[in-house]
């Protein structure tokens, strides 16, 4: 089991935890349909960056 060599000061502990907070997901709006989706993911209608890339289930 790992054992620390030296005690981490409260300041260093705070710096270590500085990026542990949650961030809201970055959302994008599809220009053709106007739907909101996660960035770098296709929209529910199968569009990505204005082009139809996947057929939707109902098509």
From Swiss-Prot:
Which organism encodes this protein?
Azoarcus sp. (strain BH72)
Region feature Disordered, mapped onto this chain: 1-25
InterPro entries, alphabetized: Ribosomal_bL32, Ribosomal_bL32_bact, Ribosomal_zn-bd
Q: What family does this belong to?
A: Belongs to the bacterial ribosomal protein bL32 family.
Sorted UniProt keywords: Ribonucleoprotein, Ribosomal protein
Q: What is this protein called?
A: Large ribosomal subunit protein bL32
Pfam families xref list: Ribosomal_L32p
This protein's GO cellular component annotations are: large ribosomal subunit
Name the Gene Ontology biological process terms: translation
Q: What is the lineage of its organism?
A: Bacteria, Pseudomonadati, Pseudomonadota, Betaproteobacteria, Rhodocyclales
Enumerate the GO terms in the molecular function aspect. Answer: structural constituent of ribosome
